[in-house]
């Protein structure tokens, strides 16, 4: 059976004046709901918060992934678990020194544990706790800064991670995140990514009407992979 490339739209990009309709469409058609949580400290921009997840918790059936681009994620694990996150994904450099404690806490809260690596972070950083993870997010641009070009060296990082997963018999998703567009679907798929995060360039900017934008995105994804 041919492997599918899963999609995770970044929900903070939804149009406030068309929010309910867009959420319903995304919930029906997506594999994950990607929630970018940014504090203006770890990254220079701001994102959505736990209230956003809590508002959707009983309205959606698709798993919500809280991508914590925040300096002190340990302080907010319980908050995001209660808000309805199925996955909680902090960054490696924000849990350094307490990685096992953080990952085990996420699991104790009933969530699946992810980890995110910026492009300059080597895979060796997560070697010892990789068996505990349910998802690894490979940032293909530096986190939290818009308008970047995809760093193509990250394709090799994904290939290496796929090899490690196979050799060790592990079971975690590999997600690619950052400046997603049709030109990188095939390279990421061929490298072994299981899922891609969709932002404005890949989805919302495709058309003024969201349903039309979604159809364009689907056609681009299909044409690039076939």
Residue ranges and their predicted role:
Residues 19, 36, 80, 136, ...:
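Conserved, mostly hydrophobic/aromatic
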Residues 33-48, 141-149, 204-206:
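Glycine-rich, proline-tolerant flexible connector loops at the mouths of alpha/beta enzymes
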Residues 22-23, 74-82, 120-131, 178-196:
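Catalytic cores of alpha/beta
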Residues 18, 86-173:
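Conserved anion-binding
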Residues 203-226:
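C-terminal helical cap(s) of enzyme catalytic domains, especially alpha/beta-barrels
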Residues 34-105:
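N-terminal active-site wall of soluble small-molecule enzyme domains
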Residues 6-11, 33-35, 56, 64-68, ...:
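Hydrophobic faces of well-ordered beta-strands that scaffold small-molecule active sites
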Residues 28-29, 59, 83, 109, ...:
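Structural motif
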């Amino acid at each position: 059976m041919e492997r599918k490339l899963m999609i995770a739209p970044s929900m903070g990009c939804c149009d406030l004046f068309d929010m309910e309709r867009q959420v319903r469409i995304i919930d029906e058609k997506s594999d994950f709901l990607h929630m970018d949580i940014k504090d203006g400290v770890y990254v220079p921009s701001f994102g959505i918060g736990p209230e956003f997840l809590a508002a959707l918790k009983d309205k959606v059936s698709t798993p919500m992934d809280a991508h914590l681009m925040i300096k002190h994620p340990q302080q907010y694990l319980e908050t995001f678990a209660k808000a309805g996150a199925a996955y909680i994904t902090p960054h490696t450099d924000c849990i350094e020194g307490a990685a096992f404690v953080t990952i085990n806490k996420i699991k104790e809260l009933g969530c699946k544990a992810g980890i995110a690596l910026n492009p300059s972070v080597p895979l060796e950083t997560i070697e010892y706790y990789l068996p505990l993870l349910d998802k690894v997010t490979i940032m293909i641009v530096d986190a939290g800064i818009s308008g970047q070009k995809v760093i193509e060296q990250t394709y090799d990082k994904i290939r290496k991670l796929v090899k490690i997963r196979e050799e060790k018999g592990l079971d975690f998703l590999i997600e690619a995140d950052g400046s997603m567009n049709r030109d990188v679907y095939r390279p990421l798929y061929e490298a072994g990514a299981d899922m891609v995060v969709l932002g404005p360039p890949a989805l919302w900017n495709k058309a003024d009407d969201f349903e039309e934008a979604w159809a364009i995105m689907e056609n681009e994804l299909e044409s690039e992979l076939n």
